[in-house]
Amino acid sequence: MVMAEKKRSKRYQKRRTIVEQGKTYSLPDAVNFLKQIKDTRYDETATVDFQLGIRPDQNDEMDRGTVALPHGTGKKIRVICFCKGEGARAAEAAGADVVGAEDLVQKIQGGWMEFDAVVANPDMMREVSKLGKILGPKGLMPSPKSGTVTPDVARAVKELKAGRIEFKSDKTGGLHAPCGKLSFPKEALEENARTLIRAVKDAKPAAARGNYLKNVTLSLSQGPGVKLAVSSL
């Protein structure tokens, strides 16, 4: 295990030396560059990493929102849905992997966690709230703000399956979100990244002042990143 860590570190450092320190890239050039240094052993995920000009200790300066990436994330998203009756049938038709009510709550309380996103009808939230300590720390608790607590569960399921993601700034003022796989055509990866960047800019808190996008980096999940020219975004 230690040897594997060393090998990964050497590969990372080798790729990192190729990145010119202090250089900024346009988004198209950044996508092209990362494709040139990609690890051919597996399909890496590209992420956009932001350092925002916010005061992260102020709740009214938190940047949070959702965005539907036009070309998806490249990852199969397992979606579960808490609903009953007609809503349950609609969620199943929309592609939900598991649909349930009290039985699904009990299943998760028993340790089952084979899912990536959660949708709930508002009338199920009394039951779903019992899972707060389980889902909350993992960022899986559904909420109206993220569009995952809604009467239109079918639409929410479809959007999540199609590549809608949630983003949220952290306690350091950073924000990190995936924008696709390096195997995507460069145009698709660029469009996804632009869509994500635009969504983060549009979600700028009203209380935030000054330079908002302090740094934006296009990175590899297991490798280095390159700084984007913020003025071009």
Which sequence ranges carry the predicted segments?
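Flexible, glycine/charged-enriched surface loops at secondary-structure junctions
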Residues: Y42-A46, A203-N215
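Intrinsically disordered, compositionally biased charged tails
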Residues: M1-Q21, A207, K227-L233
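Long, charge-patterned amphipathic alpha-helical coiled-coil/hairpin "stalk" segments used as oligomerization
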Residues: D97-K201
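Glycine-rich phosphate-binding loops that contact phosphosugars or nucleotide phosphates
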Residues: A90-D97
